[in-house]
Amino acid sequence: MANLKRIRDRIKAVKNTRKITEAMRLVAAARVRRAQEQVMATRPFADRLAQVFYRLQTRLRLEDVNLPLLKQRPIQTVGLLVVAGDRGLCGAYNANVIKRTEERVRELQETGQQVQLYLVGRKAVQYFQRRSAPIAKTYVNLSQIPTAAEAAQIGDQLLAAFLSEKVDKVELLYTRFVSLISSRPVVQSLLPLDPSRLATQDDEIFRLLVRGGEFTVERSKVIAAVSAPPQDMIFEQDPVQILDALLPLYLNNQLLRALQEAAASELAARMTAMNNASDNASELIRTLGLAYNKARQAAITQEILEVVAGAEAL
């Protein structure tokens, strides 16, 4: 009977755990939808920015403009902005980011370049602090759905480091959101800005859908519609001054997009992890139920045998 009670208690505990994991899965799904809405909300600004850059590009050659954020210089120190998460229970999301970061640091060091880490997310901060890595700045406890203000804060500090020549190049390492079950860490260059990319805002947007009772993600290519400026358009300011003022906005927009995509990747990883945990809990409950029935059947059989043996003894 003690064995039966132990199995019953374990079944109860697993059922309670399954309720928690299922609730966490649904919460993560709701937050993925919010991340999707945020991405859609930033599209008009990104499109308009691309149009302005396109119009400026028709008035001057961006490759020939001498602006600090476009200036290439010999690379001695690279600032690597790494976007990870603050919490666990999201599968291999944080581990994959950390692994790719270590690989990128080795690649840069093998070419004789020094690396300064700018870390977003408590998991990355804790990992690299334990290993005495060269950390320039840390950012923890950001919003679960990143905001423009948070992106601007990070962007301003990266700009200051680049313009003061503390770093000669800035790279961004974040997790690109592919689907609910697939994501991959990618590295892209942030600073100096590439003039050839300023007037093209090609990217993708994602939508969380429900099909057949299951969550699924649909991605679609988005190409900003740009048009040539009217021939009689007059710039009240020097186009170079306008460009110089807009470049930080472009950088912050790139950062915000990356932070949003990384947040969606983390939430999708948490959804998948909690879904797997719920499935495993259901399977364990089924296995424990069989064990309970067998133990109960054995106990009943034993009692019958004892009754029969007692009757024969009389």
Swiss-Prot record:
Function statement: Produces ATP from ADP in the presence of a proton gradient across the membrane. The gamma chain is believed to be important in regulating ATPase activity and the flow of protons through the CF(0) complex.
Coiled-coil segments: none
Keywords: ATP synthesis, CF(1), Hydrogen ion transport, Ion transport, Membrane, Thylakoid, Transport
Listed name of the protein: ATP synthase gamma chain
Xref: Gene3D superfamilies: 3.40.1380.10, ATP synthase, gamma subunit, helix hairpin domain (1.10.287.80)
One annotated GO molecular function: ATP binding
InterPro entries from the UniProt entry: ATP_synth_F1_ATPase_gsu (IPR035968), ATP_synth_F1_gsu (IPR000131), ATP_synth_F1_gsu_CS (IPR023632)
Membrane topology: Peripheral membrane protein
Principal subcellular localization: membrane
Top-level taxon: Bacteria
Quaternary state and interactors: F-type ATPases have 2 components, CF(1) - the catalytic core - and CF(0) - the membrane proton channel. CF(1) has five subunits: alpha(3), beta(3), gamma(1), delta(1), epsilon(1). CF(0) has three main subunits: a, b and c.
GO cellular component terms, semicolon-separated: plasma membrane-derived thylakoid membrane; proton-transporting ATP synthase complex
Similarity comment text for this entry: Belongs to the ATPase gamma chain family.
Pfam families, per database record: ATP-synt (PF00231)
Subcellular location per the Swiss-Prot or TrEMBL entry: Cellular thylakoid membrane
